Amino acid sequence: KDGIVDLDFLRDLVAKRGSEIALISVMHSNNEIGALQPIDKVIEIAGDIPVHCDAVQSLLKVPVTFKGLTALSLSAHKVGGPVGVGALVLKKGLDIPALLHGGGQEREIRSGTLNAPAICAFAAALTSYPSAEVSKLRDQLISGIKSSVPDALINTPANALPGIVNASFPGTKGETLLLLMDMEGIACSTGSACSAGVHRPSHVLMALGRTEDEAIGTLRFSLGSQSTQADVDRLIEVLPGVIERARAAK
């Protein structure tokens, strides 16, 4: 109910059907509500079963370690780098089939000329991230939402990424909220970038126990290294009016 992997379920599954499981793949953090997953406990439960971790959303924002993992996925575009370049970190000695065949480059794992400019841009993007400052803005935004819209439901748990605030506003529709927010000069989303434009309730929010009405009236606010106190103040200022108009429209 808090966006965290059900460890008891996983433990029971591994105990009963471990011999059938080839790989356990888990997100380091949820991209819709920001919940951080207990990766170390997943690895412990997995035992000899390989564990892959998708840390795309967490890179730079919170500590990420490869300890105990078999594979780790990273991507440049989540840290200000270009789209289309990332990294797959693999345990030493792991034999994986080649994605592309040809000249045998990169020890026959990835043939073809590498996109050197994109790779260099990825490296350049891996600079420091102001986690403490962004976390402070996130907490202020959550507090502001609660005080300005008392019946709002905060879906982001306490243990979450610095820059994600996910909130449901019962009696509204996400598309209407987006339009009204855009008219106020505020950019936000009804979910993750991967699911934007998909007109159905978020499976993440439904798994949290939200009703369909609550799930469709949800916005995700993303804060980053360039977000300011003024941005948060402006959002909190216009939010009550936006919610009132959205409810009237519905």
Put a short name on every predicted segment.
Residues 1-250:
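Pyridoxal 5′-phosphate
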